C-alpha cells in the first residue's frame, strides 16, 4: 500500500484554503484527490495548463486488465479480472488508457486523440470510472 506524505497533503490543503473561499474540508478533500491522482500519474504544468497524465500500465492494473503483446505491438494475450478476453478487447483497453489525463483547470478527464478514430469502441469510460472510484471523486 502506498504511503502518502501527510504533511504535504495538509500543507496543500491549507494553501488552497487561504487562497480560495472554500471550506477547509473541501480543500482537504481536493488535496487528497490530488495526492491519490499523483500515485497513478505525473503532474504536468506548462502553457497555462495543469494536468495529471496517468501511467498506462498503472491504469491497466487498476482496471484489472492484463495485456501482453508481440514485438510488432499487436495484442497476444488479454485477460480482464483473470478471465481471458479477446485480442480486440485488449486493443480497446490499450486505446482507452493511452494518453489519459485529468485537467485540473476544467476538472474533466480527457485523452489524447485515439489512434483508431472516434468511431472505434474504447474503454475510456470504464477507465475514468475506475479512477473516480480509486480517488473517490
Residue ranges and their predicted role:
Residues 1-137:
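Charged, low-complexity intrinsically disordered segments and flexible loops
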Amino acid at each position: 500500500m502506498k504511503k502518502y506524505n501527510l504533511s504535504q497533503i495538509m500543507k496543500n490543503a491549507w494553501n488552497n484554503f487561504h487562497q480560495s473561499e472554500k471550506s477547509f474540508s473541501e480543500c482537504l478533500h481536493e488535496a487528497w484527490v490530488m495526492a491519490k491522482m499523483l500515485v497513478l500519474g505525473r503532474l504536468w504544468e506548462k502553457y497555462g495548463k495543469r494536468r495529471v497524465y496517468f501511467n498506462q500500465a498503472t491504469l491497466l492494473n487498476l482496471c484489472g486488465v492484463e495485456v501482453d503483446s508481440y514485438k510488432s505491438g499487436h495484442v497476444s494475450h488479454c485477460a480482464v479480472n483473470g478471465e481471458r478476453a479477446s485480442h480486440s478487447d485488449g486493443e480497446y483497453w490499450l486505446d482507452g488508457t493511452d494518453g489519459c489525463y485529468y485537467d485540473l483547470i476544467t476538472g474533466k478527464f480527457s485523452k489524447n486523440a485515439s489512434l483508431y478514430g472516434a468511431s472505434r469502441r474504447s474503454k475510456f469510460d470504464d477507465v475514468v470510472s475506475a479512477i473516480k472510484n480509486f480517488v473517490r471523486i
